[in-house]
């Protein structure tokens, strides 16, 4: 009897943890689809504005020095990095761009110090994003290691 109760408790803990994890993941996706999130282009409400912001930001010089989680980065003029999700945001419109900086390694990365890398992720399928990301990659010395 005791074993059955213990098994039920363990089983219910697993499902409770699974529900908590699902809620966390859902919150991350919801946040990413907000106006200033990296996936704002997936939200019909912001799609057109995001595409226009990408075109506009692509034309700007990449010369703004900022600090992000202990690393100095150079990004496009009149943009900032969203502290919650790490994606770039256009200051003029408030739209999030599908270019995200990570404080961990990625295919396109930069070594900061021994065993510490920063990465950049971007959606190259969206017109203008590849061009903009390449400017930022070049300005910051990121290297693609996953060709």
Predicted regions and their residues:
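N-terminal targeting sequences that direct proteins away from the cytosol to non-cytosolic compartments
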Residues: 14-94, 121-147
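Short linear sequence motifs
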Residues: 7-8, 34, 39, 44, ...
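Sec-dependent bacterial lipoprotein signal peptides
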Residues: 1-15
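A short acidic-to-branched-hydrophobic micro-motif
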Residues: 89-123
